[in-house]
Amino acid sequence: MIDKSAFIHPTAIVEDGAVIGANAHIGPFCIVGPQVEIGEGTVLKSHVVVNGQTKIGRDNEIYQFASIGEVNQDLKYAGEPTRVEIGDRNRIRESVTIHRGTVQGGGLTKVGSDNLLMINAHVAHDCTVGNRCILANNATLAGHVSVDDFAIIGGMTAVHQFCIIGAHVMVGGCSGVAQDVPPYVIAQGNHATPFGVNIEGLKRRGFSREGLVAIRNAYKLLYRSGKTLDEAKLEIAELAEKHPEVKAFTEFFERSTRGPIR
């Protein structure tokens, strides 16, 4: 179903069954598959391909040569009906690729809202990208990666399968991330190692001075105290009882399967 207020360029191909919302814009030479749903006000600039069971929210801008919902690159994939979901107000720049999920990984690749995915960024099968994240040019997420809210991943950086990039993290460019990055941390290098707390980013987002001190103390317990990981976890949990900002660390530890970068 195509809303009567939507614009479809004469050279675009919108297959029967696709749902195009009000005031959406499908530019020249775009291809929209039969199981695709595109929300109100979303713009496909030109030469964009959206395939598979893909749902895109409202007011997104998707630039030329982006490919969304295509078959993933997992050799085990056998054509199962897996999905991509994208939220609202994202800017998805030229040649970005977002692949559908796998049955083994839950069947869903998900991108939240208000994100910026720069040129050539890749979001592999079963990844989850939160809200207000930035993936810079050529940033690459392998399968099953989680990127939490407000994280920034620098250009040419690769993230290993199943890694977690915590909330408010900044990963420097040309890095290789092979373990989980705790929230609020700056990481850099190959293999990526911690370089302190993302203080400037947290200040811009309105964190209080007291909260910043607590986050720094949690960071010091994890990386500067000489304690074992288990010992640091216990003391960080005690700190989190007094400072809600530190709870992000304890929640991260519960999710982490690859262990924090060291």
From Swiss-Prot:
It comes from the Bacteria. The gene is lpxA. It is found in: Cytoplasm. Keywords: Acyltransferase, Cytoplasm, Lipid A biosynthesis, Lipid biosynthesis, Lipid metabolism, Repeat, Transferase. The keyword Chaperone does not apply. Pfam families: Acetyltransf_11, Hexapep. Pathway: Glycolipid biosynthesis; lipid IV(A) biosynthesis; lipid IV(A) from (3R)-3-hydroxytetradecanoyl-[acyl-carrier-protein] and UDP-N-acetyl-alpha-D-glucosamine: step 1/6. One of its GO terms (molecular function) is acyl-[acyl-carrier-protein]-UDP-N-acetylglucosamine O-acyltransferase activity. It is an enzyme of class 2 (transferase). This is Acyl-[acyl-carrier-protein]--UDP-N-acetylglucosamine O-acyltransferase. SUPFAM superfamilies: Trimeric LpxA-like enzymes (SSF51161). Involved in the biosynthesis of lipid A, a phosphorylated glycolipid that anchors the lipopolysaccharide to the outer membrane of the cell. GO terms for cellular component: cytoplasm; membrane. It catalyses: a (3R)-hydroxyacyl-[ACP] + UDP-N-acetyl-alpha-D-glucosamine = a UDP-3-O-[(3R)-3-hydroxyacyl]-N-acetyl-alpha-D-glucosamine + holo-[ACP]. It comes from Salmonella typhimurium (strain LT2 / SGSC1412 / ATCC 700720). Belongs to the transferase hexapeptide repeat family. LpxA subfamily. CDD domains: LbH_UDP-GlcNAc_AT.
